[in-house]
């Protein structure tokens, strides 16, 4: 069956309701202290899901925020991995620039200010298909088992590959792609991290099913589970996607792949 209005489809709408709750609660004065923070980059009031942790108090509020949303939705609200990615990439890019004189940290700060100012949902994309897990990325029979650079240009890079099980990817405005394992020098083309808009040319999302998702469509008085809220995942495929230099945060500095993962 071809779905023309997927936004309101009963198997898909619940996941949209979940991420919408991260915006609704941030507008509620009752939850302002948990759901919002002051940006360390601009001094502006921002959604805590876009915040760089500055203290142990920030970390406690992060957990309390997640508990609150769990109570409100009883499901996945889809912005947690993106939030963790912000903090991991922020610190990692600083270390890379210190060693190599690159400009990844400034790239990332400019991107994050844009995310904060517009309260964007960003998917943290880390899990590659992997193929034969006994082999390194460069040893795979299919090179696209891990996201990798296939072309380097003066103005950016072209990437191919995929990321699996991307919760909330279809509801995200942007993706941050990161390595999924530590890598050696032979894998330097796979040591790549970047931001990419969801509607980029060459980016495809194959929507996945949820366990018991058809219960939300059944009639009668039988239990339909969590009817208003739910999850969704997608396989995100990159088919020769161009990434401009300003959105690149790692490009061949293989020894830092594990740093981002950690």
What does each of the following model-derived ranges do?
Residues 10-13, 17, 113-116, 158:
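Generic structural signal for well-ordered, non-transmembrane alpha-helical segments
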Residues 5, 101, 224-227:
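Hydrophobic alpha-helical scaffolding
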Residues 1-39:
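Acidic/polar, glycine-rich intrinsically disordered N-terminal extensions of enzymes
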Residues 124, 129-262:
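FAD-binding core of flavoproteins
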Residues 10, 38-44, 231, 235:
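Terminal targeting/low-complexity segments that flank the catalytic cores of oxidoreductases
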Residues 24-122:
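Internal helix-loop-helix
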Residues 23, 27, 115, 119, ...:
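A generic secondary-structure signal for well-formed alpha-helical elements
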């Amino acid at each position: 069956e071809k779905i023309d209005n997927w936004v309101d489809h009963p198997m898909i709408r619940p996941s949209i309701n979940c991420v919408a709750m991260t915006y609704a609660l941030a507008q509620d004065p009752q939850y302002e202290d948990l759901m919002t923070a002051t940006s360390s980059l601009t001094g502006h009031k921002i959604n805590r899901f876009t915040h760089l942790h500055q203290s142990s108090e920030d970390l406690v509020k992060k957990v309390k925020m997640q508990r609150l949303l769990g109570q409100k939705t009883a499901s996945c609200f889809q912005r947690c991995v993106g939030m963790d990615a912000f903090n991991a990439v922020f610190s990692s890019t600083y270390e890379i620039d210190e060693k190599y004189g690159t400009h990844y940290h400034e790239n990332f700060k400019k991107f994050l200010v844009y995310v904060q100012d517009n309260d964007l949902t960003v998917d943290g994309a880390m899990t590659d298909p992997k193929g034969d897990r006994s082999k390194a990325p460069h040893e795979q029979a299919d090179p696209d088992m891990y996201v990798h650079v296939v072309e380097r240009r003066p103005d950016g890079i072209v990437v191919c590959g995929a990321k699996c099980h991307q919760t909330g990817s279809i509801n995200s405005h942007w993706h941050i792609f990161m390595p999924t394992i530590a890598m050696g020098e032979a894998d330097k083309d796979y040591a790549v991290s970047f931001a990419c808009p969801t509607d980029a040319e060459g980016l495809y999302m194959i929507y996945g099913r949820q366990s018991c998702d058809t219960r939300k469509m059944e009639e009668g008085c039988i239990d339909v589970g969590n009817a208003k809220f739910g999850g969704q995942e997608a396989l995100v495929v990159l088919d020769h996607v161009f990434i401009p230099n300003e959105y690149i945060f790692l490009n061949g500095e293989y020894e830092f792949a594990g740093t981002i993962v950690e």
